[in-house]
Amino acid sequence: MLLCPVCHEPLVDDERGAACAGGHRFDRAREGYLYLLRSSKSGDAMGEPKSQARSRRDFLNRGYYAPLRDAMVELVREQVSGRATSTGSPMTLLDICCGEGYYTSAMGAVPGVDAYGFDLGKEMVRLAAKRGDATFFVANMKDIPVADGAFDMVTELFAPFNEREFSRVLAPEGSLFTVVPGARHLFGLKEVLYDTPYLNDEKLPQTTELELVGTQRVSANITLQTQADIEAVFQMTPYYYRTRPADKERLANLDTLQTDIDFIIAEYRHR
């Protein structure tokens, strides 16, 4: 299933971690994850800072995005019940850019699923491994260290879309589920930040190797209960980095915030 990131030979588990026939060894961290990057420095230097990773974990643990989590879990259940193998072996799932594992562990807890998740940030994967219900590893989505066609289900939520790698790791009859923000996602946040708030462009990935077979909208209205929650969700958005300091101050003065959450789940399969 997993490949050596150096020579791309299969990795074999042992007591300490995993190794390939080429002699490359990867130790398992205390939390249980594998570090599958070529450079030992990349995982610390890339990804979100520790404080931001923990803030995101705490935000998600409060259940604000539970509607999306539950929708993803239900899709996985449907896949398992509708395409169960005659051998009785579990269906494999890969969560790309899994972050701190909130969605991965929920999907991995579905009976009949063997889940894997990876992220570029070591702190994210460390937190994810503590959740359990999946095999976690640090890796780069530009060169995913897994075998061709190894996964019956591939999921990616809000990550850049790498069609070459996503289609490579997806099994011939598998399904890829990608999640993008809906038009009104966090519109209440934008109403505070901007004088003229705008709707998101619901742009689904355009593909050549994969075919869009269906979409599903998940939406709800939530009330963020603390300033920490408001700041955490703001940091999870791309406009956190391009909003003027004066506009950020508007959020800093709020203790609660009501807003829509809005997601589009799109399913792709091989053409």
Model-derived segments and their meaning:
Residues 1-46:
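N-terminal auxiliary segments of SAM/dcSAM-dependent transferases
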